[in-house]
């Protein structure tokens, strides 16, 4: 009988990252786990619709036996079966993040018996989760370098809090994992600003772009008007293309927050990234831990290790025979497999 891994959901950042990482790793390794205190560090602890959808999606893909899979549950037992490729569709039923559900199940499908397609409906532009364009334009090119081939398509936007968006990813089994070396980002090649609008006046986007232009030299400035029924919503993004990596930063607009303030938040985040010589931003660092661990080698630099990153590393080390090293030097933290 395989050993049971016991996890404390209050560990580290105390949110859903522990659960998502554990589900991915359990499916890959075949190791069962229990987790208590799910999202103990949040104002509303326990499983929300997004987390419950991730659990049910993982269970369907690997025919797992699950206990505690219900809204509000703070305890879960997950016994995985065999991962099967196929065509899967999952509905969150709220504006919960589609990409976080995909993030949970796609790594397991790298080990499936054939190609797969996973479609998730819910929220696509959520202030607490990476949008589909981040996955598509930033993460997936790096995964391709590692021998991981998946392609994400944003079918329909769904802004928080209404939801209604659809994201799909096609993924193939991985033949061989390659190592990723991202010690330096290199010189900046170009920067691109983009604003999405749905049911929001165009002058909002124009003011957001003006704020970005006031701080950066942009090679491109794009405003995309989406159908009104995909909103109301607004997202402003800035993409930084460097010699070795492309990073993308975003802020989701909020009611009663001016366009200038929304864009200024983005400017602050991008300036913080550019102020450090680190190659990888905070969100991307979280996403690279698992594929790097599966490759068994590699490294990247980040300005500061976030609580999400440290939590993710701790969970990975419980399931896989790897150890990460974090070394601070020259204004960055170098994260590597020891």
Curated annotation (Swiss-Prot):
SUPFAM superfamilies registered for this protein in UniProt: EPT/RTPC-like (SSF55205), RNA 3'-terminal phosphate cyclase, RPTC, insert domain (SSF52913)
Annotated catalysed reactions: a 3'-end 3'-phospho-ribonucleotide-RNA + ATP = a 3'-end 2',3'-cyclophospho-ribonucleotide-RNA + AMP + diphosphate
GO biological process, any: RNA processing
Positions annotated as active site in the UniProt record: 308 (tele-amp-histidine intermediate)
Species of the source: Escherichia coli (strain SMS-3-5 / SECEC)
NCBIfam families attached to this UniProt entry: PRK04204.1-2 (NF003246), PRK04204.1-3 (NF003247), RNA_3prim_cycl (TIGR03399)
Protein's UniProt name: RNA 3'-terminal phosphate cyclase
Free-text function comment from the UniProt entry: Catalyzes the conversion of 3'-phosphate to a 2',3'-cyclic phosphodiester at the end of RNA. The mechanism of action of the enzyme occurs in 3 steps: (A) adenylation of the enzyme by ATP; (B) transfer of adenylate to an RNA-N3'P to produce RNA-N3'PP5'A; (C) and attack of the adjacent 2'-hydroxyl on the 3'-phosphorus in the diester linkage to produce the cyclic end product. The biological role of this enzyme is unknown but it is likely to function in some aspects of cellular RNA processing.
Residue numbers binding ATP: 103, 283-287
Encoding gene per record: rtcA
Pfam families membership: RTC, RTC_insert
Methyltransferase listed as a keyword: no
């Amino acid at each position: 009988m395989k050993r049971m891994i016991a996890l404390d959901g209050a560990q580290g950042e105390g949110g859903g990252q522990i659960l998502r990482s554990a589900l991915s790793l359990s499916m890959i390794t075949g190791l069962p786990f229990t987790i208590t205190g799910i999202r103990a560090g949040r104002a509303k602890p326990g499983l929300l619709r997004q987390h419950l959808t991730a659990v049910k999606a993982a269970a369907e893909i690997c025919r797992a036996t699950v206990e505690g899979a219900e809204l509000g549950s703070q305890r879960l037992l997950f016994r995985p079966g065999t991962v099967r490729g196929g065509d899967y569709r999952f509905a969150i039923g709220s504006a919960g993040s589609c990409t976080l559900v995909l993030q949970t199940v796609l790594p397991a499908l790298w080990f499936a018996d054939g190609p797969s397609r996973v479609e998730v409906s819910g929220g696509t532009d959520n202030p607490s989760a990476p949008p589909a364009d981040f996955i598509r334009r930033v993460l997936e090119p790096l995964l391709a370098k590692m021998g991981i081939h998946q392609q994400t398509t944003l079918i329909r936007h769904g802004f928080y809090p209404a939801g209604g968006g659809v994201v799909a990813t096609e993924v193939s089994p991985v033949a061989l994992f390659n190592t990723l070396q991202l010690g330096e980002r290199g010189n900046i090649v170009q920067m691109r600003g983009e604003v999405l609008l749905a049911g929001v006046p165009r002058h909002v986007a124009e003011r957001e772009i003006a704020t970005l232009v006031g701080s950066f030299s942009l090679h491109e400035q794009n405003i995309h008007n989406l159908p009104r029924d995909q909103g109301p919503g607004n997202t402003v993004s800035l993409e930084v293309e460097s010699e070795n990596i492309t990073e993308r930063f975003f802020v989701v607009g909020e009611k009663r927050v001016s366009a200038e303030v929304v864009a200024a938040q983005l400017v602050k985040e991008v300036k913080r990234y550019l102020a450090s010589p680190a190659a990888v931003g905070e969100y991307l660092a979280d996403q690279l831990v698992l594929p790097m661990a599966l490759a068994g080698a590699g490294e990247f630099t980040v300005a500061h290790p976030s609580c999400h990153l440290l939590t993710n590393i701790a969970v990975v080390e419980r399931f896989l025979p790897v150890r990460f090293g974090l070394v601070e030097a020259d204004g960055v933290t170098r994260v590597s497999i020891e």
